[in-house]
From Swiss-Prot:
The lineage of its organism: Bacteria, Bacillati, Bacillota, Clostridia, Eubacteriales. One of its GO terms (molecular function) is ribosomal large subunit binding. Responsible for the release of ribosomes from messenger RNA at the termination of protein biosynthesis. May increase the efficiency of translation by recycling ribosomes from one round of translation to another. Pfam families: RRF. This is Ribosome-recycling factor.
Length: 185
């Protein structure tokens, strides 16, 4: 039963890491990355669809994204969705494709981006600590229900703490790498 609790906590921690990586990949760092557009949804026959389901997004150059809609009438809808987004990008269309030029980041923008990266990392750490607390609470509840010894409880809590420390260390390295990417000119 203790193994199940620890395994469950570990799976949740891994999921938190993948969410963090996903969130960071959508933050622009002065380079074109198709995942920047993952949060953009386009109206398609009355329903909102992710851009990736109605168009092909590629990065032919380091600072250019190219969007090729699968249906030409979607061109205007995609342009509208990009303009409405918080990305601050201006689409230019030639009638069949949309090009997005990613502007160079200013020093001020880089600093703001680094703050957002750190904030996102801190939110991930808070989520990890919450997972640890939940796991430890379940272990303590097992102590009462299944008559576990103090040593068994302490050993299980130590294992949860080791896993937590490893994941927090991984988060720190992910954040440091993203900061380096943002600050490199």
């Amino acid at each position: 039963m203790i193994k199940d609790i620890i395994q469950n906590a570990e799976e949740k921690m891994k999921k938190t890491i993948s969410v963090l990586k996903s969130d960071l990949s959508t933050m622009k760092a002065g380079r074109a990355n198709p995942t920047m557009l993952d949060r953009i949804h386009v109206e398609y026959y009355g329903s909102m669809c992710p851009l990736s389901q109605v168009a092909n997004v590629s990065a032919p150059e380091p600072r250019v994204l190219m969007i090729t809609p699968w249906e030409k009438p979607l061109l205007k809808e995609i342009e509208k969705a990009i303009l409405k987004s918080d990305l601050g990008l201006n689409p230019s269309s030639d009638g069949s494709i949309i090009r997005l030029v990613i502007p160079e980041l200013t020093e001020e923008t880089r600093k703001t981006l680094v703050k957002n990266v750190k904030k996102t990392g801190e939110e991930a750490k808070v989520a990890i600590r919450s997972i640890r607390k939940t796991a430890n609470d379940k272990i303590k509840a097992l102590k009462k229900d299944e008559d576990l010894s103090e040593d068994q409880v302490k050993k299980a809590e130590d294992e949860v703490q080791k896993k937590t420390d490893a994941v927090v260390k991984e988060i720190d390295s992910i954040i440091a790498a993203k900061e380096k990417e943002v600050l490199s000119v």
